[in-house]
Amino acid sequence: GILPECKLVPEEISFVLSTRENRDGVYLTLQKLKNGKMFKNSDLSSKKVPFLIHGFISSATNKNYADMTRALLDKDDIMVISIDWRDGACSNEFALLKFIGYPKAVENTRAVGKYIADFSKILIQKYKVLLENIRLIGHSLGAQIAGFAGKEFQRFKLGKYPEIIGLDPAGPSFKKKDCPERICETDAHYVQILHTSSNLGTERTLGTVDFYINDGSNQPGCTYIIGETCSHTRAVKYLTECIRRECCLIGVPQSKNPQPVSKCTRNECVCVGLNAKEYPKKGSFYVPVEAKAPFCNNNGKII
């Protein structure tokens, strides 16, 4: 038929595995990993393993994820796993049909979440990766997938993921849903959400901390015509800059808005990014932002 299939075969989901030794990454499937000698003599117990999960009509090779992978590897000797579920995300469909496929892509998110939960279980049980070293980072539908992975993983009774970072979690089809059917603060010990678009994302609070960047909509520097898509993907770029630069974006508690960032202390404000959970404050934060990369609002201040 004419309708897009956006067909997802879990066994065919692939991923790009990148390390400092192999920055360009190796394309693998879970089957190859299980049968391969890849980690035969590697001790992975000290390795941090972030999973990156792309969104609708995207893929693991998208420049934004490649940039984030590079930033993560520059910072730390880790193993980055970028999940590629492009078929299920309608990325290979005919241009005009891609968008009609959205409900199908939404349907596929649970299966991808289950795949990631199974994958992390294998890493922990077979390759001795420590649960405390796993972190999920997902954008748009990928953020919803991270939530489903968190729910699935808890069924194994091995504990909870330490952290999920949801980058502008997809709003359409999820806005009115309750916890079991969307990303939720109980999906990991710490769930960090960046809100950057009110139409493609959601204004609803979802995590342990919710950062509303520029009030969570219409990002500066995004022009009117492609504004929504630009604002939506900005969440990925913001996190990449926060990986590159410590305390690049500082969040002010919503209750204190419009307090300037310069008045922030470590006890009341929180830095967006990999160290957010080191700060005591939880809840909703307002994050002013610049229009151009590196977007930082801290003027060199580190709290």
UniProtKB/Swiss-Prot annotation:
Family to which this protein belongs: Belongs to the AB hydrolase superfamily. Lipase family.
Tissue: Expressed by the venom gland.
TM stretches of this protein: none
Record-annotated active site: 140, 168, 232
Biological processes per GO annotation: lipid catabolic process
Recorded GO MF terms: phospholipase A1 activity; phospholipase A2 activity
Native species: Dolichovespula maculata (Bald-faced hornet)
Keyword hit for Transmembrane helix: no
Biological role stated in the UniProt entry: Catalyzes the hydrolysis of phosphatidylcholine with phospholipase A1 activity. May act as an allergen and induce hemolytic activity.
Taxonomy, superkingdom: Eukaryota
Matching CDD domains: Pancreat_lipase_like (cd00707)
Record's protein name: Phospholipase A1 2
Coiled coil: none
Gene3D superfamilies: alpha/beta hydrolase (3.40.50.1820)
CC per GO annotation: extracellular space
Cysteines paired by S-S bonds: 6-90, 179-184, 247-271, 248-296, 264-269
A Pfam family this chain is assigned to: Lipase
Cellular localisation: Secreted
Enzyme Commission (EC) number: 3.1.1.32
Root EC class: hydrolase
Catalyses which reaction(s): a 1,2-diacyl-sn-glycero-3-phosphocholine + H2O = a 2-acyl-sn-glycero-3-phosphocholine + a fatty acid + H(+)
The entry's keywords: Allergen, Disulfide bond, Hydrolase, Lipid degradation, Lipid metabolism, Secreted
